[in-house]
Amino acid sequence: MAMWKKKKTPSILPLVVVIAAASLIAPTTAGWSSGTATFYGGSDASGTMGGACGYGNLYWSGYGTNTAALSSALFNDGASCGQCYQIACDHQAEPRWCLQGRTVTITGTNLCPPNYALSSNDGGWCNPPRTHFDMAEPAWLQIGIYKAGIVPVLYQRVPCVKQGGVRFTMGGFNYFELVLISNVAGSGSIQSVWVKGPNTDRMPLSRNWGANWQSHAGLVGQTLTFGVTSTGGQTLVFQNIVPAWWKFGQSFSSNLQFSY
């Protein structure tokens, strides 16, 4: 991968260039942070399917190709799954490889694991405490030049926009149910979940891995209601979203969606 180095900016610039640069400088004073980005998954992003959040086929689950694997500093042991980030290639730092004035909004769907065998500045891009996005190639190409390999970026967390309602996918087995909660708008990520059935008192679920929440109750054969609180602090109750005839592997979409 090509390396990037910060270049000196000429002291005298045409007015049009100064105006363009201002749009890139402004994010650093408005809650933007600095990081780096690479890409993976091929031109159709088929290599990004699955992943440490558990969303499976990202085409089918609504996440598409504007996705990224997050370094562990961002991934937060899976608590950041589903969060959305607006990313701009830092054209001031690396004008050779950045598309000026472009941004892309991605969803965190995977973990970019650390590689301690490599230096954090030479291949170990996802080593902590680096904030790094290993982006799906189609997302990367909206802000950077293919042969760059790695570029400096500016990023900020933004609200997620999704089509349709929150989706619940039932996995695991009886007395060890795994509930995948996906297609979450607003803050994109989940803080807490509870479940209640006609034969089961309301009980909290715990995060097992990624966006999968677990229950040790026998939920088979029950109509299930879920209460979900987003990391933005909004709580929605999905009344009887899962019918009594549900089977493991089935997904159920709601008509409710988070706004924050």
Curated annotation (Swiss-Prot):
Signal peptide range in chain numbering: 1-30
Cellular localization per UniProt: Secreted, Cell wall; Membrane
PROSITE patterns in the record: EXPANSIN_CBD (PS50843), EXPANSIN_EG45 (PS50842)
A Pfam family: Expansin_C
One of the protein's GO biological processes: plant-type cell wall loosening
Gene3D superfamilies attached to this UniProt entry: Expansin, cellulose-binding-like domain, RlpA-like domain
GO cellular component, one term: extracellular region
Expressing tissues: Expressed in roots.
SMART domains on file: DPBB_1
Annotated membrane topology: Peripheral membrane protein
InterPro entries: Expan_Lol_pI, Expansin, Expansin/allergen_DPBB_dom, Expansin_CBD, Expansin_CBD_sf, RlpA-like_DPBB, RlpA-like_sf
Main location: secreted
Residue ranges annotated for the Expansin-like EG45 domain, each copy included: 50-165
Expansin-like CBD domain ranges (all copies): 175-254
Keyword tags: Cell wall, Cell wall biogenesis/degradation, Membrane, Secreted, Signal
Family: Belongs to the expansin family. Expansin A subfamily.
Function: May cause loosening and extension of plant cell walls by disrupting non-covalent bonding between cellulose microfibrils and matrix glucans. No enzymatic activity has been found. May be required for rapid internodal elongation in deepwater rice during submergence.
The protein's name: Expansin-A15
Gene name tied to this protein: EXPA15
